[in-house]
């Protein structure tokens, strides 16, 4: 495999992508974490059972990974790239950054 390609997105970029519908935010935290609270409009796809072939898709939306603080989301990028997918974006601050900024939680 070649070198890992990662693009860090910040809170404003994630909010913009969710608002304009251009982004599908894939939360790779565990189900109990997702159930306890998640970013509105994000979808759950836990890293513990991560299957790049089973990633959700939405017409016209790019996949961006998110986790608690930007560690597991980078691992998800690595797994996706190892599977041949050209996915490289993640929310660097993750759910902790979202909550700290006072954003709404689902």
Residue ranges of predicted features:
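Rhodanese-like catalytic fold shared by cysteine-dependent sulfurtransferases
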Residues: 1-24, 30-62, 71-106
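Short, surface-exposed ligand- or partner-binding patches at beta-edge/loop junctions that are enriched
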Residues: 66
């Amino acid at each position: 495999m070649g070198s890992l390609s990662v693009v860090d997105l910040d809170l404003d970029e994630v909010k913009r992508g969710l608002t304009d519908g251009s982004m599908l935010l894939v939360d790779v935290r565990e189900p109990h974490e997702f159930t306890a609270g998640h970013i509105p409009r994000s979808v759950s796809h836990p890293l513990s059972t991560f299957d790049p072939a089973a990633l959700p898709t939405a017409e016209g939306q790019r996949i961006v990974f998110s986790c608690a603080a930007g560690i597991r989301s980078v691992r998800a990028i690595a797994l996706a790239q190892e599977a041949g997918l050209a996915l490289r974006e993640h929310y660097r601050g993750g759910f902790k950054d979202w909550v700290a900024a006072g954003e709404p939680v689902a």
